[in-house]
Swiss-Prot record:
Reactions the enzyme catalyzes: Hydrolysis of terminal non-reducing beta-D-galactose residues in beta-D-galactosides
Gene it is expressed from: BGAL15
Segments forming domain SUEL-type lectin: 694-779
Species for this entry: Arabidopsis thaliana (Mouse-ear cress)
Active site: 178 (proton donor), 247 (nucleophile)
Coiled-coil spans in chain: none
Pfam families the record matches: BetaGal_gal-bd, GHD, Glyco_hydro_35, SUEL_Lectin
GO MF, any single term: beta-galactosidase activity
The name this protein goes by in its record: Beta-galactosidase 15
Enzyme class: hydrolase
């Protein structure tokens, strides 16, 4: 008995020894009593594969992040009430342990409303279909379900001892999400709801602080935080709450038909440096890796399958240079200043014209920022006896208040130019061979046969429970020969919120309609021939992601809302027959999905591309549909929806883990509107060339991401002009041959590092101009 007690005591002491105390004061998050500068990045586990997670998280750490932040996706984990899924890339615990194994912290945003451009904001549609349900307010049914899911997630994480208070990586947890943006629409019920959220979260006793983002009135002890492109002017609602930024948008999401969003590297860096200049101490990038909206997870509506987000890591996990490298350099500088930023006394010097210097002073030393918020005018100032040139819309950082170590507008990191290459698998045929199987729709077109029947037009979510993008609405109309609506000039008029609509009368396709993004309520009308006797009307409603944002967004309709009319015209007379209360039959989905034809071995087969570079499938020539690789749903495709030459891409991510490295691979396509698959092909994506434009007294680092540098296309030290791919020599140039030096130092190597100085490249008579080394290398 004595021996057993001793063993139990040792276990308890050992467990407690590894616990981390996470708290906060008005200056910073504290870890084991020490104030910390914390830099975090969002990586959503379902938007990549389990095989990608270690590399993505490792690159986050190598980018000098401290933490990885993720949402928890309710509808992915509980697609059917009380039936849970944590398999594959939904294995939240495995993801959190991967973060832990890399020695990083975790930030767990449970929500469980997530927005995130995710289908229905992460809410399961069965929740909407519960009687009397209202989302995100003091609705008993909603609060019960939210508490059930939140508690389940917390208990799962506790069981694996993953909160910092248990020795795990999670230092912060989040309840709700951006509710402050919509709280006004809910009145007093909204205020009561957010108080309930705080009380419920606090009762779960996770042992780390809870945060609420975009919630100015977040109840204590919740920490309110900021989301946006810039949060330097944000002020917490409590003097004991540190200044925290949970979403620094590194780019933006993409809509079908839209252009690729882009946020400059310089602007992201400026926003971060400005935030820390103005007393911020926790910052998270949304996104650090965006990834892919596999299957039907994209929300919106009209959010694309790619969720690249112009993040520091691209959709495939490649370094998005120069964004990744320029931010890493910023992180290193901020970490080096951690003590002065979190403990120093703060003073500010105003130079006018939107230029300020901020000094953080401790007994050991000082660190300084010089910020120029003027968007057009560079600044030349004298600060503490030294002259500094600060470009417009930039921040210079002086860790010792003397030497400028970093400026947000001066990029010294390489730019990587990514290229796509054809599949070079051994013995791969130049074209794919295809087999075809048509979708069997006779039962719905000619018989109007469905799974359920009601005398009402229902919202698609109610009938389909979001089990499919596709819902058939069918009715049979008996017209007598003397019916006044019958005639030569007839049409079918449909009031609809379907994102895409196909209409059939008596088995004939009379037309289709695709809505413009944002204009989801419309009237479709098309000429149609009706006959005396029975006429079968079949409408196929298609959704392209359910709404994920807004007050009461659960009430945004999808499908055939009605009314539906047969219109007859006889001279100047218009006769209208309302079919809205007819007997309507409903059928969810398509037979090919139900019969799992996507797992068939009969469609096109091909060999996996050689090597380890990311793989894409180019679906140019196709219309709209869904694609599967070896039974894995890689998401919706819609190359036919091109707004202009800068619009949607026809290339879709195929994770390497979906491929068979030996033997054949199977591609299955469901093509909805028709297309030509002869152009479909597989490609790999890798670094084709790298460029750099590095200021003197910095280090040039070139890397071809595991491939050798094969040639130096351009090199000049002085004041070269142009951009990557079009560099040209300037008015002054160093005496030594820069191209020859770089050829000797770099060609044949996977990476190289060179000091940019006159000692290396020779004198350049450039006067007062800042000297730079411009390089373009071929990989």
């Amino acid at each position: 008995m004595v021996s057993l007690s001793f063993i139990l005591c040792c276990v308890l002491v050992s467990s407690c020894a590894y616990a981390t105390i996470v708290s906060h004061d008005g200056r910073a998050i504290t870890i084991d009593g020490h104030r910390r500068v914390l830099l975090s990045g969002s990586i959503h586990y379902p938007r990549s594969t389990t095989e990608m997670w270690p590399d993505l998280i490792k690159k986050g750490k190598e980018g000098s992040l401290d933490a990885i932040e993720t949402y928890v996706f309710w509808n992915a984990h509980e697609p059917t009430r009380r039936q849970y899924d944590f398999s594959g890339n939904l294995d939240l615990i495995r993801f959190l342990k991967t973060i832990q194994n890399e020695g990083m912290y975790g930030v767990l945003r449970i929500g469980p409303y997530v927005c995130a451009e995710w289908n229905y904001g992460g809410f399961p549609v069965w929740l909407h279909n519960m009687p009397g349900m209202e989302f995100r307010t003091t609705n008993t049914a909603f609060m019960n379900e939210m508490q059930n899911f939140t508690t389940m997630i917390v208990e799962m994480v506790k069981k694996e001892k993953l909160f910092a208070s248990q020795g795990g990586p999670i230092i912060l947890a989040q309840i709700e999400n951006e509710y402050g943006n919509v709280i006004g629409s809910y009145g007093e019920a909204g205020k009561a709801y957010i108080q309930w959220c705080a009380n419920m979260a606090n009762s779960l006793d996770v042992g780390v602080p809870w945060i609420m983002c975009q919630q100015d009135d977040a109840p204590q002890p919740m920490l309110n935080t900021c989301n946006g492109y810039y949060c330097d002017n944000f002020s917490p609602n409590n003097p004991n709450t540190p200044k925290m930024w949970t979403e620094n948008w590194t780019g933006w999401y993409k809509n079908w038909g839209g252009k690729d969003p882009h946020r400059t590297t310089e602007d992201v860096a400026f926003a971060v440096a400005r935030f820390f200049q103005k007393e911020g101490t926790f910052q998270n990038y949304y996104m650090y890796h965006g990834g892919t909206n596999f299957d039907r997870t994209a929300g919106g509506p009209y959010i694309t399958t790619t969720y690249d987000y112009d993040a520091p890591l691209d959709e495939f996990g490649n370094l998005n240079q120069p964004k990744y490298g320029h931010l890493k350099q910023l992180h290193d500088v901020l970490h080096a200043m951690e003590k002065t930023l979190t403990y120093g006394n703060i003073s500010t010097v105003d130079f006018g014209n939107l230029v300020t210097a901020t000094v953080y002073q401790t007994e050991e030393g000082s660190s300084c920022f010089i910020g120029n918020v003027n968007e057009t005018s560079d600044a030349k100032i004298n600060f503490q006896g030294t002259s500094y040139d600060v470009p417009a819309w930039s921040v210079s950082i002086l860790p010792d208040c003397k030497t400028e170590t970093y400026n947000t507008a001066k990029i010294n990191t390489q730019t990587s130019v990514m290229v796509k290459k054809a599949n070079e698998a051994e013995n791969e045929p130049s074209t794919l061979k295809w087999s075809w199987r048509p979708e069997n729709i006779d039962s719905v077109l000619l018989k109007g046969k469905g799974e359920s029947t009601m005398r009402q037009l229902f919202d698609q979510k109610v009938v389909s429970n979001d089990e499919s993008d596709y819902l058939w609405y069918m009715t049979t109309v008996n017209l007598k020969e003397q019916d006044p609506v019958l005639g030569k000039n007839m049409s079918l008029r449909i009031n609809s919120t379907a994102h895409v609509l196909h209409a059939f009368v008596n088995g004939q396709h009379i037309g289709n309609y695709r809505v413009e993004n944002g204009k989801f309520h419309y009237v479709f009308e098309q000429d149609a021939k009706f006959n005396p006797g029975a006429n079968v009307i079949t409408l196929l409603s298609i959704t392209v992601g359910l709404p994920n944002y807004g007050a009461f967004f659960e009430n945004f309709s999808a499908g055939i809302t009605g009314p539906v009319f047969i219109i007859g015209r006889n001279g100047d007379e218009t006769i209208v027959k309302d079919l809205s209360t007819h007997k309507w039959s409903y059928k969810t989905g398509l037979s090919g999905f139900e019969n799992q034809l996507f797992s068939s071995e009969s469609p096109s087969t091909w060999s996996a591309p050689l090597g380890s570079e990311p793989v894409v499938v180019d679906l140019l020539g196709l219309g709209k549909g869904t694609a599967w690789i070896n039974g894995n749903n890689i998401g919706r495709y819609w190359p036919a929806f091109l707004s202009d030459i800068d619009g949607c891409s026809a290339e879709y991510h195929v994770p390497r883990s979906f491929l068979n490295s030996e033997g054949d691979n199977t591609l299955v396509l469901f093509e909805e509107i028709g297309g030509n698959p002869s152009l479909v092909n597989f490609q790999t994506i890798g670094v084709g060339s790298v460029c750099a434009n590095v200021y003197e007294k910095n280090v040039l680092e070139l890397s071809c991401n595991g491939k050798p540098i094969s040639a130096i296309k351009f090199a000049s030290f002085g004041n070269p002009g142009g951009d990557c791919g079009s560099f040209e020599k300037g008015t002054c140039e160093a005496s030594n041959n820069a191209a020859a030096i770089l050829t000797q130092e770099c060609v044949g190597k996977e990476k190289c590092s060179i000091d940019v100085s006159e000692d290396k490249f020779g004198a350049a008579e450039c006067g007062a101009l800042a000297k730079r080394l411009a390089v373009e290398a071929i990989c």
